[in-house]
Curated annotation (Swiss-Prot):
Function field: Enzyme which catalyzes the acetylation of polyamines. Substrate specificity: norspermidine = spermidine >> spermine > N(1)-acetylspermine. This highly regulated enzyme allows a fine attenuation of the intracellular concentration of polyamines. Also involved in the regulation of polyamine transport out of cells. Also acts on 1,3-diaminopropane and 1,5-diaminopentane.
EC number(s) on file: 2.3.1.57
Catalytic activity entry: an alkane-alpha,omega-diamine + acetyl-CoA = an N-acetylalkane-alpha,omega-diamine + CoA + H(+); spermidine + acetyl-CoA = N(1)-acetylspermidine + CoA + H(+); spermine + acetyl-CoA = N(1)-acetylspermine + CoA + H(+)
Protein name: Diamine acetyltransferase 1
One Pfam family matching this protein: Acetyltransf_1
Subcellular location: Cytoplasm, Cytosol
SUPFAM superfamilies: Acyl-CoA N-acyltransferases (Nat) (SSF55729)
GO-annotated molecular function: diamine N-acetyltransferase activity; identical protein binding; N-acetyltransferase activity; spermidine binding
Keywords from the named record: Acyltransferase, Cytoplasm, Transferase
Amino acid sequence: MAKFKIRPATASDCSDILRLIKELAKYEYMEDQVILTEKDLQEDGFGEHPFYHCLVAEVPKEHWTPEGHSIVGFAMYYFTYDPWIGKLLYLEDFFVMSDYRGFGIGSEILKNLSQVAMKCRCSSMHFLVAEWNEPSINFYKRRGASDLSSEEGWRLFKIDKEYLLKMAAEE
């Protein structure tokens, strides 16, 4: 399958983006944690101040999924800032449906993301990968990615909404 196109997502792609987010979550054994809705995606990514950007991989009709989907992959990203090195492209989610892997779709998405990062003068692209996800780790390493958790010893933390509310209310 040589025919596919990578393009910026539009608001009308949100149902497909949500479908792929859920497929990725299932692949990562976390499908019960997706609480986002299609409406959230539309408001958060396509409003006046988008919180994320998204690329989608679209195949022609002859390669649609058995369920009739033309969108078979996506990458959700946003820009952030590191006071040591400057602008970063943060890759939040990246997924290609299993039946469509091995055709260069993921590589082309990553190429497009790299072009976006260079156009915006980003110093690097950051992302997380589950420790058990060797295929993805190898995919990224083949393209020059370094594992900061082992090289620099960083740990990822989060503060849930419950605690954010508590801290915000403190006097």
